[in-house]
Amino acid sequence: MLTTICLDADDTLWHNERLFQFTQERFAKLLSGYVASDHLIDRLRDAERRNIERYGYGIKGFTLSMIETALQVTENRVPGSVIAELIACGQEMLRDPIELLNGAEETVRTLAADFTLLLITKGDLLDQERKLAQSGLGKFFDGVEIVSEKTSEVYVDIFGGRGIDPRHALMAGNSLKSDVIPVIAAGGWGVHVPCSPSWDLEATDAPMQHNRFREITALSDLPGVIKDICGNM
């Protein structure tokens, strides 16, 4: 029987990626006089990929990647005013109020009544804490884990540290790469909850043939899937 339900935060409980994509569009407009938009976004994505190990996930690393890309594509000729605007973009992102996804609060409330409920999210500590506080959902969780990366080893450590048998744990989130595949590798159940738009750097194939993998169209479907899994364990 499942005893522990783990949930991702960004683009699982509240919108996140669309803010990044909106800012990317602003970035492209600011640099439109120097390089084609498509090429610029490719360069930004490459910078993000390189910088994850340096800065981790989140708005601060994204802002630094925009500045780095602006300097590269202009051969260090980008005006200081543009750099200032990019910094302002990052600051605006950090102030942006969150918006819960449809059914998020009701689903979290339902799950909290019957299971140990954990929030497992990756990203900047201060920003993730800010978003959780704004969401009003913190009161439903028995524990919160904000990590720099989501690997099978990280999930093993979280489960082990909390005395959780991974065979009785389920993780649900929008990222196959971070929320589903590593949890299955750690011995748990993984439920994919797609959200659009999605981040290219998290794209990977779904483990469709694995018996501990499920996919749903909305978070509100999760209690039903959990009931089905428990009924067949």
Please identify what each model-predicted range represents.
Residues 32-47, 75-86, 140-143:
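Short, surface-exposed acidic
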Residues 1-2, 105, 109, 124-233:
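Asp-based, Mg2+/Mn2+-dependent phosphohydrolase catalytic module
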Residues 20-28, 63, 67, 125:
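An amphipathic alpha-helix signature
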Residues 1-43:
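Active-site neighborhood of HAD-like aspartate-dependent phosphohydrolases
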Residues 80-99, 104-135, 145-149:
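Substrate-recognition element of Asp-dependent hydrolases with the DxDx(T/V) motif
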Residues 23-28, 44, 48, 86-91, ...:
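Hydrophobic alpha-helical core bundles mediating ligand binding, dimerization, or RNAP-core interactions
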Residues 47-92:
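A metal-dependent, Asp-based hydrolase signature
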